Structures are given as C-alpha cells and as structure tokens.
Amino acid sequence: MRCPFCGNVDTQVKDSRPAEDHVAIRRRRFCPACAGRFTTYERVQLRDLVVIKSNGKREDFDRTKLERSIRMALQKRPIEPERVDQMISGMVRRLESLGETDVQSKVIGEIVMERLAAIDTVAYVRFASVYKNFQATGDFEDFLSELRPPAPTTDT
C-alpha cells in the first residue's frame, strides 16, 4: 500500500482487526521511509455499482461520497461512529443486493432518508434539505408538517 504522506510503496501492517461488525478489516500501517502512520479498511465488494444521476449522467458509486454526506447530516448528533459505519455498510449491501449494477441516485437517496429517519430526526431533516433541494423556509415547514402527527382536536 502506498504511503499517503511520502508515496513510498513499501509500508508495513502493524495491526489488523475486524471492524464494522466483522464486515471489514481495519489495518494500522506504518511507513518506514517517513515514519508516517495511517489506517486502511478492507471491505468485500460484491459488484461495481454505477450511479445514474437525475440528469442522466453516469458515475461510479463512491462509498466515501455516501459516507461524507451521511456524516455531514449527523454532525454534532449523539450517534456513535460505529453505528454510522454499520448503517453505511448495510446500505451498500442493500444496494449490491438489488441485483442491478446501475442504481438511480433517487434510490440511494431514499435508502439514506429511510435509515436516517430511523436513527435521528434532525439528521433526517438536514439530509432531506439538501436531497430535496429546499429553497425557502416554507420548504422546511412543509416537510416538518409531514413529520408531525396532526394536532388533536378538542370537542367542546
């Protein structure tokens, strides 16, 4: 593995252990050339997925991009990093198990929305505001009104 600090190709594995509920291997690496230390993760990839964007453009599925958007929605929320890793791994497995190599970006967005709604409402609303392209406060109000149960009516 190439060192991200100096580019040396001869790095050493100092520690390996299961991660993400045994669906990945976390490796701690050391570069003898610059003494840099870094971590890598090894995961099983069942198939190469291609994302079809709403404008028709196709691009390779990027787990890191998915992870970044989810972590941004969960920023400063009381969710353990391990739970986030498990959630992301579960979403990737679900996408791979669809049986298709081409996946609409809308499908990915809906899966993320579903998972975030189950673990944190604030993160769900944050993600929805970007995913559904909210433009004004009214967009938030409309979305939040769909989340809230209707107020009980009083019969007098």
UniProtKB/Swiss-Prot annotation:
Record key words, sorted: ATP-binding, DNA-binding, Metal-binding, Nucleotide-binding, Repressor, Transcription, Transcription regulation, Zinc, Zinc-finger
UniProt GO molecular function: ATP binding; DNA binding; zinc ion binding
Stretches assigned to coiled coil: none
unnamed zinc-finger residues: 3-34
Cofactors named for this entry: Zn(2+)
Domain ATP-cone residue range list: 49-139
InterPro entries for this protein: ATP-cone_dom, NrdR-like_N, RNR_NrdR-like
Domain of life of the source: Bacteria
GO biological process, one term: negative regulation of DNA-templated transcription
Record carries keyword Zinc-finger: yes
Note accompanying the cofactor annotation: Binds 1 zinc ion.
Pfam families tied to this protein: ATP-cone, Zn_ribbon_NrdR
Record HAMAP family: NrdR
Function text: Negatively regulates transcription of bacterial ribonucleotide reductase nrd genes and operons by binding to NrdR-boxes.
NCBIfam families assigned: transcriptional regulator NrdR
Protein family according to the UniProt entry: Belongs to the NrdR family.
Name of the featured protein: Transcriptional repressor NrdR
Organism expressing this protein natively: Jannaschia sp. (strain CCS1)
Gene that this polypeptide is encoded by: nrdR
